[in-house]
Amino acid sequence: MSRRRFLSIGSKLAALSLAPALIRTASAQEGVSSKTVTIGCSSAMSGPLGGFGSAIKVGADAAIGQINAKGGVQGRQIELQMVDDGYVPQRTADNVRKMIDDGSVFALMSCMGTANNAAILPMVEASSLPYLAPFTGASSLRNTGTRNVFHVRASYTDETHRLVQKLLGMGIKDLAVVYLDNAFGKELLADATAAMAVKGVQPVAQAALATDGKNLSEVVAKIMAGKPAAVLLGTAGTASVGLIEALKKASPMMPLVGQSVTLSALDQKNLGAMGSGLALSMVFPDANRAKTPVVRDYQAAMRAIGKDEFSQGSLESYINTRVLAEALERAGRDLTRTKLRTALLSFDKFDLGGFNVDYSKAAPFVGSHYVDLGVLGANGRFIG
């Protein structure tokens, strides 16, 4: 046999032996089979913000159960691949990198945290992995250069400006700000000072709270020294609980206002009566009031999986999953990532039943600017 003939046969055999692996890789890269479509999520299931991650999981499970019970999307069942990152940005990046390298997910949904999302957005863009509903409202992560990221919730800037405007409109100008000592908190501080500056006001005191709350006493002392009329909380997770308790003890009647992520449902439960009177911004309807079809659907889905405690976090995750399912349905049976992006861009005031999502405008793609205000009662639920 000639050398040329030998090499020709050898190369063909090698190609044939590799073909099944290549076919598997091409298929796995999209996280799609004839029967399933797999969605990835990295979130804090443990650590100081573990309550938020648990809510994301429960809300997604409720929506997926409801959708799959009706036949799924285009004949496929939705599967969620959720991995704990403990709210550590490097772990988030490692988790998402593994999903991309393994080719195990078709799209990404609701990864949590400002610094965590900052760590993964470059690889999301580089890999062309569609990413729906980051669980953060940071404006720094919403820029015109992104083409694969579709936000659902309103921004922290939207929330902060609404809160500051409300306080100033009530004649309360001596505002103090406590912010978490990380990227999330520092951005909220910038939003708050910018919103106040518009009205010619600046904080009478500001202090950075460690994510584990270890400097709580110093923070409270610094804030109270400024003699504020109200305190704006740019904090999240268990650190918020200790802060609210300490501020309430220092000045029981002083108004405290926070954002949608200041407290998880578990945090609200742990606060109990100490949380009564706390004002919070809301970027989704009240999860405990079945006034809109989407909230009624959510509550039914939660009950179907044996959950009868409703929360803003699980409602947000439920809505995010419903948005993704609608996009998957619009993308058609012959599913590709490009078709999913095109489907999302077709959302023009899409009404989920009292909550609209719109991606018809230019990037950054932000589906909602809904912001409302609520006040907690002693039972941890919004009053009225």
Regions found by a protein language model. Give the residues of each.
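Periplasmic-binding protein-like
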Residues: 99, 104-112, 132-134, 176-179, ...
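Beta-alpha junction/loop-to-helix N-cap segments that form part of ligand/metal-binding clefts
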Residues: 30-32, 51-58, 73-140, 209-216, ...
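Segments of small-molecule ligand-sensing domains
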Residues: 304-314, 325-382
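Extracytoplasmic "Venus flytrap"
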Residues: 32-33, 37-59, 83-89, 112-113, ...
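Signal peptide-proximal N-terminal region
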Residues: 58-80, 198-201
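Extracellular/periplasmic periplasmic-binding protein-like sensory domains
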Residues: 244-317, 382
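N-terminal export signals
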Residues: 5-26
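Extracellular/periplasmic Venus flytrap/periplasmic-binding protein
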Residues: 90-94, 139-140, 147-251, 286-296
